[in-house]
């Protein structure tokens, strides 16, 4: 009984020190990585898929041919003047994302360096005059380039960065950037 009396205040003190999970309830989820890292250094937040509609600068056929997968759905972000486009596979998973940024040169370069960090990516200079990087990731590949105040970044679920590069070049051409 004496142990119980001494143990009760210790338990009460420890209970106030951390999160509590009660059996049979959902555990609290940690903050998402996009919340913490997407706005690092004052960069615009990562785009989020919104309305289901055609991408205004890339057709589904172009993406299907470049990425080698059928496109079942396209969603676009609310970003303006150029929304990010999310292309989905038939199983409902994103196969390719294209983000276009037009603003100031420092932010454009920072977005490219965030997507394809200088120290871990291969240099990219295609199309002519654009600079950035490409790399394979655990989920596929990224190709990201900037020129002046514009940046175009493509992420694919395919390991070959040439697929993302092809889409970036098509987007740049369609938008006349």
Task: Give, region by region, the residue ranges found by the protein language model.
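Amphipathic alpha-helical interface surfaces
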Residues: 59, 107-108, 167
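Extracytoplasmic low-complexity, Pro/Thr/Ser/Ala/Gly-rich segments
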Residues: 25-91, 172
């Amino acid at each position: 009984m004496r142990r119980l009396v001494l143990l009760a205040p210790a338990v009460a003190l420890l209970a106030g020190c951390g999160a509590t999970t009660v059996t049979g309830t959902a555990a609290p989820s940690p903050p998402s990585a996009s919340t913490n890292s997407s706005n690092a250094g004052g960069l615009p937040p990562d785009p989020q898929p919104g309305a289901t509609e055609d991408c205004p600068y890339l057709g589904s056929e172009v993406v299907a041919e470049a990425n080698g997968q059928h496109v079942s759905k396209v969603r676009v972000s609310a970003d303006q003047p150029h929304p990010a486009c999310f292309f989905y596979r038939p199983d409902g998973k994103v196969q390719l994302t294209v983000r276009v940024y037009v603003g100031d040169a420092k932010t454009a370069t920072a977005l490219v360096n965030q997507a394809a960090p200088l120290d871990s990516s291969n240099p990219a200079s295609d199309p002519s005059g654009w600079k950035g990087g490409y790399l394979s990731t655990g989920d596929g590949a990224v190709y990201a380039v900037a020129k002046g105040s514009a940046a175009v970044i493509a992420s694919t679920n395919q390991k070959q960065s040439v697929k993302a590069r092809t889409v970036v070049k098509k987007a740049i051409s369609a938008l006349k950037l």
